[in-house]
């Protein structure tokens, strides 16, 4: 089943937490570099293998519903504490994102300003306005990058429903990255 109707984001923090792809945040990935499953359908295998062989794909991996269902949403990455997202009020469709360590880098604060009550006391998502910018900070956890404000719950709902019929280990998500 193609994920396009369910998931149409390119969130590298999520891909890093699940598969280790572009894992700039430093998450401990759940299913890194597994390649294609040995029992993958021949049609999908031939399509994906040709893309990987041609250098059009970075790599492939897969993860079972059993593994996804056991994820710890409070798990944090090793390199960063949060993610800043901002956009101009006049261009809400053009989002900018930056992963931030603790303390926040001065260049990030110069762009987005200082949230109230301050960058070091934010325990949950915080939104604020700086001039023409709408800004948001969220702590960086597995739950934040795969949670309800993302498109992943749609994917997980379908996988959970299929697992009800085929078992938790009988349902998996197969991915390939360019």
Name each model-derived stretch.
Residues 1-168, 178:
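Acidic (Asp/Glu-rich) sequence patches and key acidic residues
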Residues 170-173:
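Conserved GNAT acetyl-CoA-binding A-motif
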């Amino acid at each position: 089943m193609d994920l396009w109707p369910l998931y149409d984001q390119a969130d590298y923090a999520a891909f890093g937490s699940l598969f280790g792809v572009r894992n700039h945040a430093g998450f401990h990935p759940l299913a890194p570099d597994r390649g294609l499953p040995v029992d993958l359908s021949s049609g999908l295998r031939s399509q994906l293998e040709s893309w990987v062989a041609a250098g059009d794909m970075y790599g492939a991996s897969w993860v079972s519903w059993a593994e996804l269902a056991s994820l710890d949403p409070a798990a944090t990455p090793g390199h960063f504490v949060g993610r800043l997202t901002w956009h101009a009020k006049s261009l809400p469709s053009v989002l900018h994102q930056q992963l931030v360590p603790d303390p926040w880098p001065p260049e990030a604060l110069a762009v987005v300003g200082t949230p109230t009550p301050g960058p070091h006391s934010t325990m949950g998502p915080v939104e604020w306005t700086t001039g023409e910018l709408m800004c948001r900070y969220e702590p960086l956890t597995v739950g934040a990058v795969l949670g309800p404000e993302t498109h992943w719950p749609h994917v997980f709902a379908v996988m959970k429903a299929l697992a009800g019929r085929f078992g938790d280990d009988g349902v998996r998500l197969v991915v390939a990255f360019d």
